[in-house]
């Protein structure tokens, strides 16, 4: 026999379901647009998801949801929504333009050109504004493609020219992994370690790899790091990121243990140094006798 508490809970749940069903796709869209206006992209995305469930063939809902995905850095999902947009409305020019812009930013110049050709093929340039934007975008794509080809040549010939061309290209395609890698390498060749490290850090977020995280950790901690600087903290953070992506990576595990041990010894030694206890400083840096030296002196 159902208890009073169970009956009340079921009645409340039924009421919630009825209220949820009463909210239309149009209502969810209003909520989503309001969330976008207030920069609540996660809230907008949730509302768009509900709208899609209720009206899965509304091309405008997919188009608007792609905006929320882009704001949250979900490029792949944004492109999928734009693809669905033109599936349901092949003549909707704004979707082609937005897709081509994303592909340009990502450094996918061939795909961006193909997208604009598809726009032309489906006669999607319904407005004069769309035509002008498509022409301007096509010129940017051609320029970016030309810069990339020149950068490939300069990369092995002139570090100065390489950095200059990469700077120009990254203004058009800031998420181009190839261009950013080449600028980092050329910056290092010019002796600009700070610039190279900045690009490597961006690459580590765009395309994480254990090798890159290890490199950034060593540079940040041992070369760029100074006492009480954020760079030493960054050195440890890069190794934590490596272990987060690949918990079984032996190199990152070993490096993380070593760096934590060194960091602990340095902090201990600095404390003794502040108190002018010089013998204790040396002992702290050498480590326990049984465990061998922490640092080579």
Enumerate the language-model features and the residues they cover.
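Alpha-helical segment of the N-proximal tetratricopeptide repeat
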Residues: 24-54, 146-173, 182, 265-294
